[in-house]
Amino acid sequence: MCALAKIVSEQLGGSLSYEEYGNFGFATDVQRAKLERKSNVLYVGDLAKGACRHRALLFKFLADQVGIECRLQRSRHVRGAHIGHAWNFVYTDFDKVFVVDLMHAVGALYPEGSTDANKYARLDAFAFSTLIEGAGPALGL
């Protein structure tokens, strides 16, 4: 699982700190890919930079291909800095569920419901918290 997470992260721009994420600039790369394709429909492989949702989708697809039991989860935020946030749950043979980090500490597995899992999933975040803290909003595809 960790190796797959690292492959996904490297394909879509690498590891970022929480502070760097607001200024990652993936929306510019999405626009570039749309212009090149002359379409709003893109392949994940068109992107050199991907946000959490792009990484979560690619991880889910690849995990399914290699038989890793996985679920893609989308955020409850419908506006604000965390709109479109997504992450993956992975399941072990021992009925344990983990959130896999594809953005920050790439490959880390956080037990479901743990402080780290909730932070990664932004479950306790106010929808506009990134804007309030001064970082740019996470916009894009």
What is each model feature region?
Residues 1-45:
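Secondary-structure boundary elements
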Residues 50-130:
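Hydrophobic/aromatic-rich core segments of domains that either
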Residues 127-141:
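Long, acidic and serine/threonine-rich low-complexity regions
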